[in-house]
Amino acid sequence: MVTIDEVAEILSKRSLEYSMINYPDKKEKSIDIIAVNRNKKMIVKILGNKKSSKIKSDLKNIARIGLGIPVIIEDSTEQEIINDRGNILGMNVETFERILDGEKVFLYKTRGGIFVKINSKELKKKREEMGLSLGEVAQALGVSRISIYDYEREDSYVSIDIAEKLVELFGDDILGDVLSGFKVDEKDINLETQTASLSDKIMLNLNEKGYKVVKMNFTAVDIIASKNDKKLLFSVEADNVSKSLRKFNEAKKITSKIKASLIVVVKESKNKKIYEKEDFNTISENEIMNYEFD
């Protein structure tokens, strides 16, 4: 099983910008590394052969709010194939390295089988350069004219058989990249505000102000909010000052890589000045419901 340090070494060898997230340490955490590669922010978790639906929930929330591409590095995945792990991209370390080196990965494995991503713009460009009609291409592939129209309208996933025929006609430039344009459906965002916890109060306030809000469970950030281009990350004070400072510093690593603002939420008002001396932007629990986040 590949380790966090080994993945960090892979990134270092390529002189890529990254941060290792070291909070929490006594239980599973959802983010091991945040890396920036060719303007793509990758939120990385090394799982090996382990499975954790709770960790995956955190990763999906990060993607839903638009902070980066959620990646799980695992041992079981085949090389040069990306697995659909419920709107998270699962891959082995060799495939991860290929992506870092600028290679496109076009094979995507779901429960329905293995599919190939097609670059719609390149497909249309090649077809028009060759002077072929939609009908002629459809006949060559044994599909409907509407199918070819759909392939050209937006990037699509097709069967391996169809992909091979497309490559025979137009060359491998028409193959797409699974990471390109990756996004998670926002309709699954759940505020989870059944209780009146501190985090729930913050989320309610943000939601009323028009923010998209998600709750995190296994990292240094407790809440992530997004509105237009504005992104806010909230880290709630832990059990003691020492643990809180470590948590806040790890949260700062996350915000620095995804260009967001960090807000520290203080439970004990007597500690507010301590955190402010460390240059953290703080709000107290009593200020939450009336705080203007805009």
UniProtKB/Swiss-Prot annotation:
Pfam families attached to this UniProt entry: HTH_3
Xref: SUPFAM superfamilies: lambda repressor-like DNA-binding domains
Organism for this UniProt entry: Sulfurisphaera tokodaii (strain DSM 16993 / JCM 10545 / NBRC 100140 / 7)
Protein name: Putative HTH-type transcriptional regulatory protein STK_12680
Signal peptide: none
Alphabetized InterPro entries for the sequence: Arc_TR_HTH, Cro/C1-type_HTH, Lambda_DNA-bd_dom_sf
Record HAMAP family: HTH_type_cro_C1 (MF_00584)
Ranges where the HTH cro/C1-type domain occurs: 123-175
Keyword Transcription: yes
Record feature DNA-binding region, as residue ranges: 134-153
